[in-house]
Amino acid sequence: MLKNDRYTYRVTWSEEDEEYVGLCVEYPSLSWLAPTPQEALEGIRQVVADVAEDMEANEETVPEPLALRHYSGKFTVRIPPDLHRRLALEAAEAGVSLNRLASAKLSQ
């Protein structure tokens, strides 16, 4: 296993495979099927460790864990002009900024 494993994992049920599937957000092409959630998590963690070790040995860039990334709180979203207008009107009618309205809608 990785010494300082800080990657983001998820275990979910696969109806198609009739098993649990372990996934890693930072390595979207990897997965591990197992009969129990615990085994799926252990399996995907081992696969990630093996792949990261191989990448390091080949001097490839290993993905940075999401948990270590800095988030500024800002991102740009492109929307159609008519939606921009509707949201601006809704914000004005509510007496809030467009940013505050968009943030409230995104957090729902």
Each model region followed by its residue ranges:
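Short aromatic-glycine-(Arg/Gly/Cys) micro-motifs in beta-strand/loop hairpins
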Residues: V11-Y27
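Short, charged, surface-exposed hinge/linker loops at domain edges
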Residues: M1-T8, R45-Q108
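A short, exposed loop/beta-hairpin motif centered on an aromatic-Gly-Thr core
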Residues: P28-E39
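Intrinsically disordered, low-complexity segments enriched in polar/charged residues with Gly/Pro
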Residues: E18-V21, A40-L41, P63
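Short acidic, gly/pro-rich beta-turn/loop elements at beta-sheet edges
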Residues: E19-V21, W32-A34, L87
